[in-house]
Amino acid sequence: MNQTVELNYDMLADKGLRFANYLIDLVLQYGIGYLIGLVIGLMYKHLNVVAPYELITNMGGFGEVVFSYTIMLFYYFIFEATTQRSPAKFITGTKVITFEGEKPSAGTILKRTFCRMIPFNAFSFLGELGKGWHDTISDTYVINVKKYEEALQLKNSFEEIGSGIKE
């Protein structure tokens, strides 16, 4: 039995799911940033570890952007390279695949993740096909897992029927 099926555009996650993914992941990334700040503050207060505290409190606007992008890069790369899904994609039942229906390589996920830093990328999925620039540039797709699995099951059923006829 095949474990992949070629992409059908009906399988693509709709714009509502894509927007939900964006919002959920954004909130979680802010939460991670908050937790990092909390840990640094507690280390400063209780253990007198000064260097990280001074770094965070004196970083300025550019430093805050670098800090945010660093969290974002690690967040998406770790989750999508290992599971094809960010936490939001688990919640909404979506995942990242290639056109052939396969798991993208780590290099492809890294490219996809860096493309998220393109200004206004977060809203680029609002176009006609619901594909963001980070999808288009990395040649990946965000699909509805349920629809994908239904198509895979149908394909495997036809293959079983076909193999039964040959025997």
Task: Locate each region found by the language model.
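Membrane-interfacial and juxtamembrane segments of integral membrane proteins
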Residues: 1-167
